[in-house]
């Protein structure tokens, strides 16, 4: 199956079990519930996630850059499956009013990122 491309689209209440080989550019995800979803070979470039709840999501060979996370809840997410993480290409552009529980951000070079409007519980930030 060929790679799917989405530009400027809005996805409301999407709850995939598996998402593979898709590129999302400047898309908006609203009220999306990703519970145990497996996300492979996908790109999220300049996307906004608003009032989304993710739990046990696994990223493999994925890329995220300049994503806005607004009023979201993330539980048990290992963000390490995102490729292209560096001081120059940040996965997150903004995070406001988000709750992170049991997340792992290891090796993501997030020292300059402002998470001050978010809450955290039992998260790991090794080598950030």
Describe every region a protein language model picked out.
Residues 1-128:
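Tandem repeat scaffolds
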């Amino acid at each position: 199956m060929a790679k799917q491309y989405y530009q400027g689209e809005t996805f409301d209440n999407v709850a995939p079990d598996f998402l593979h080989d898709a590129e999302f550019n400047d898309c908006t995800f609203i009220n999306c519930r990703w519970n145990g979803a497996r996300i492979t070979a996908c790109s999220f470039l300049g996307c906004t996630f608003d009032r989304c709840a993710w739990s046990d999501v696994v990223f493999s060979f994925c890329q995220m850059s300049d994503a806005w996370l607004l009023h979201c809840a993330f539980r048990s997410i290992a963000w390490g499956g995102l490729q292209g993480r560096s001081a120059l290409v940040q996965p997150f552009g903004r995070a406001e009013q988000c709750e992170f529980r049991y997340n792992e951000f290891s090796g993501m070079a997030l020292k300059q990122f402002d998470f001050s409007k978010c809450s955290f519980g039992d998260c790991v930030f090794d080598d950030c």
